[in-house]
Amino acid sequence: MTRLENMYKKEVVPALIKRFGYSNPMAVPRLVKITLNMGVGEAATNKKVLENAVADMAKVSGQKPIVTKSRISVASFKIRNGWPIGCKTTLRRSKMYEFLDRLINISLPCVRDFRGIPPRSFDGRGNFNMGVKEQVVFPEIDFDAVDAIRGMDIAITTTANSDAEAKALLDAFNFPFRN
């Protein structure tokens, strides 16, 4: 069991029961999954770029990502239906908690001019979305071996019914929200 899983069971659940008055510990919001997505627009012209993006995401997530393909042809983007244009992976259970621990304690403090994450990134249903502008903030990525700086989207899915519950859950994990 990872550090954040222990923290969730021993500290977060009792704190959220006390704050929101849940009658059952199973009613307390929990993390379901973390989805990482990296869109690589230049993959339409250069296949090597997508291979490097997949390798970077595999290092960051600890599992092999799937290659996403375009659903429709768009002439202005110069892509056709079925062409590979990005990669994504879904983290669950212990890998999810390990990634969140590294994100909170190692990667986000490495971001230049980091003053916290704005709390307006909730979707109204208890899920949180954020973006990272460069993949080199993760310690698994070697800065010298990177061919291009790429960002990625991080979607944290919870069982919370409201944004307030989800924010309280992430606050309990010491998520660095902006004041």
Swiss-Prot record:
Keywords per UniProt: Ribonucleoprotein, Ribosomal protein, RNA-binding, rRNA-binding, tRNA-binding
Example GO biological process: translation
Matching SUPFAM superfamilies: RL5-like (SSF55282)
MF annotations from Gene Ontology: rRNA binding; structural constituent of ribosome; tRNA binding
Example of a GO cellular component annotation carried by this entry: ribonucleoprotein complex
Description of how the protein assembles with itself and partners: Part of the 50S ribosomal subunit; part of the 5S rRNA/L5/L18/L25 subcomplex. Contacts the 5S rRNA and the P site tRNA. Forms a bridge to the 30S subunit in the 70S ribosome.
Protein task: This is one of the proteins that bind and probably mediate the attachment of the 5S RNA into the large ribosomal subunit, where it forms part of the central protuberance. In the 70S ribosome it contacts protein S13 of the 30S subunit (bridge B1b), connecting the 2 subunits; this bridge is implicated in subunit movement. Contacts the P site tRNA; the 5S rRNA and some of its associated proteins might help stabilize positioning of ribosome-bound tRNAs.
Name recorded for this polypeptide: Large ribosomal subunit protein uL5
Originating species: Xylella fastidiosa (strain M12)
